[in-house]
């Protein structure tokens, strides 16, 4: 008698649950970007009297009426995907400034926290590493070591903390005060001086200090994502390189940033 042998199913190239969540998050931000960018464009043209203001407002209102309900539906679906995830339940859901869409992006792009043995590797993946004293940037002909979409997501996290954060907004304010007292990045930059001459001046630009503060806070936040997720999963956790090797004294523990009573965004 001939025996039928059933071949094992082929190994998937990706975790379908993770990729499903990622596609939902990307769809949400793609639609939001279309709405915001188009509205900004028509309003800008109206301000330059290229387009009638009434028409610009009609277009903006139409976009909002059409796309905001779709964004809301996607947000609801994303919430269903993330609500049972360990790092959402244990950490992300308790942070002001992090809603289901940002959390969904973080969870889906990281996938398995076990593949990041150190927080430095996670920082680099999100474009937060410091290379030769500077943040890593795209260079023609060179391989990048970060995910450009993750870098954008990290930027969105920072903007959200500034707008609606609490504990991390407080940390941002502290960093602003620190960098102002320090004189910005501590370096001098070429600026225009008297009579149009180029001179070296200390870094005190508000925009630069703002970006430095956001970057510092976002790095601490992703350190907290890494630590909390690994602790919850029972994986080993090490101190960041600046603490362990460079002797930096300030360490922010993730549990100190849990905010009880937070309303889901």
What do these predicted ranges mean?
Residues 34-44, 48, 80, 160-163, ...:
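Intrinsically disordered or highly flexible coil/loop and linker segments, enriched in small
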Residues 257-265:
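Acidic, Ser/Thr-rich low-complexity intrinsically disordered segments
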Residues 205-242, 246-257:
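Basic, amphipathic alpha-helical segments enriched in Lys/Arg and hydrophobic/aromatic residues
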Residues 42-101:
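Helix-hairpin-helix/helix-loop-helix acidic hairpins
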Residues 1-47:
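Phosphate- and other anionic-substrate recognition elements at nucleic-acid/protein interfaces
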Residues 92, 106-211, 215, 225-228:
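Phosphate-backbone recognition surface of nucleic-acid-processing proteins
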